[in-house]
C-alpha cells in the first residue's frame, strides 16, 4: 500500500529548533504582558485567559498573575492550548511587522513541490497552534508555502506523545493508517504514531540526537516515493 499522505512535525524536522527557542519564544515572552493588556476584551484572548485560570486552578487570578503563569509555561515549554493560541496571536503581530521570517530548512522547501507532484497530501502536526503553523509556512524565508499543504493539526487533535492523536488524524484525513507517513525527530512521537498504525520515519538533523530503530533520513531530499 503506497504512501498517500505525509504528516510532518515542525520543530526539528521542517524548522530549526533554535528558531523556535531563540526567536519565537523570547518574542512572545517579551510581548506577552502588553499584548494581554491591550487585547483582554477580545473574545478569543479573553477565553484563553479564562482557560489559563482553569488549568492553573486559580479562578480569581489577576491579569498580572495570568502573565506570570504564562511566562512560567513558556520557560517550561508547556504544551498548553491557551498558551499556544496566545503565542500564535503574538507571533502574527511579529510576522506582520517584519520582526522575523519563519525558518524552514531549504531541503523541505525544495521537496514540497515533488511531494505534491506525486499526488501525495501534505499535513503538519505541531504543539504550536494551527494559526502559528500557517504563519510559519506563509511567512517563511522560502516564501509562502501554504499552497502545498492540505491541512494542519495541533494540540486540539491530541497530545503528540499519545496514540489517540494519530488515530484522530487518520480519521480526519480518511486514509488507511499504512497510507500515512509521519516524519519527526522525536522518538516518543514516532512510537505513538506507529502504535496508531502509521508508517514512521525519524528526521536526524543533529549528530547528538537520540535515535531509535526507525527508518531515518537526514533531510527531505532523501525521501523516495
Curated annotation (Swiss-Prot):
Cofactor: Mg(2+)
The UniProt record lists the keyword Transferase: no
Pfam family, one: Hydrolase
Enzyme class: hydrolase
Cofactor note: Binds 1 Mg(2+) ion per subunit.
Pathway(s) annotated for this protein in UniProt: Amino-acid biosynthesis; L-methionine biosynthesis via salvage pathway; L-methionine from S-methyl-5-thio-alpha-D-ribose 1-phosphate: step 3/6; Amino-acid biosynthesis; L-methionine biosynthesis via salvage pathway; L-methionine from S-methyl-5-thio-alpha-D-ribose 1-phosphate: step 4/6
Keyword annotations from UniProtKB, A to Z: Amino-acid biosynthesis, Hydrolase, Magnesium, Metal-binding, Methionine biosynthesis
GO biological process: L-methionine salvage from methylthioadenosine
The EC number(s) this enzyme carries: 3.1.3.77
Catalytic activity: 5-methylsulfanyl-2,3-dioxopentyl phosphate + H2O = 1,2-dihydroxy-5-(methylsulfanyl)pent-1-en-3-one + phosphate
An annotated Gene Ontology molecular function: 2,3-diketo-5-methylthiopentyl-1-phosphate enolase activity
Listed SUPFAM superfamilies: HAD-like
Family recorded in the similarity comment: Belongs to the HAD-like hydrolase superfamily. MasA/MtnC family.
Cross-referenced HAMAP family: Salvage_MtnC
Function: Bifunctional enzyme that catalyzes the enolization of 2,3-diketo-5-methylthiopentyl-1-phosphate (DK-MTP-1-P) into the intermediate 2-hydroxy-3-keto-5-methylthiopentenyl-1-phosphate (HK-MTPenyl-1-P), which is then dephosphorylated to form the acireductone 1,2-dihydroxy-3-keto-5-methylthiopentene (DHK-MTPene).
Complex and partners: Monomer.
Protein name: Enolase-phosphatase E1
Organism: Shewanella loihica (strain ATCC BAA-1088 / PV-4)
Amino acid at each position: 500500500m503506497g504512501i498517500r499522505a505525509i504528516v510532518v512535525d515542525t520543530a526539528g524536522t521542517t524548522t530549526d529548533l533554535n528558531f523556535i527557542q531563540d526567536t519565537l519564544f523570547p518574542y512572545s515572552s517579551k510581548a506577552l504582558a502588553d499584548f494581554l493588556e491591550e487585547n483582554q476584551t477580545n473574545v478569543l484572548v479573553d477565553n484563553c485567559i479564562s482557560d489559563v485560570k482553569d488549568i492553573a486552578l486559580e479562578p480569581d487570578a489577576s491579569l498580572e498573575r495570568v502573565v506570570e503563569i504564562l511566562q512560567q509555561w513558556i520557560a517550561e515549554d508547556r504544551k498548553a492550548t491557551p498558551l499556544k493560541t496566545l503565542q500564535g496571536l503574538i507571533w502574527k503581530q511579529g510576522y506582520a511587522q517584519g520582526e522575523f521570517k519563519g525558518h524552514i530548512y531549504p531541503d523541505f522547501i525544495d521537496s514540497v513541490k515533488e511531494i505534491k507532484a506525486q499526488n501525495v497530501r501534505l499535513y503538519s502536526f505541531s504543539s504550536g497552534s494551527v494559526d502559528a503553523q500557517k504563519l510559519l509556512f506563509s511567512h517563511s524565508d522560502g516564501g509562502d508555502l501554504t499552497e502545498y499543504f492540505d491541512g494542519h493539526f495541533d494540540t486540539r487533535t491530541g497530545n503528540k506523545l499519545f496514540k489517540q492523536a494519530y488515530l484522530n488524524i487518520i480519521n480526519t484525513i480518511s486514509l488507511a493508517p499504512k497510507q500515512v507517513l509521519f516524519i519527526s525527530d522525536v522518538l516518543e512521537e514516532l512510537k505513538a504514531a506507529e502504535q496508531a498504525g502509521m508508517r514512521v520515519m525519524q528526521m536526524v538533523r543533529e549528530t547528538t540526537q537520540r535515535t531509535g530503530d526507525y527508518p531515518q533520513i537526514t533531510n527531505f531530499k532523501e525521501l523516495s516515493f
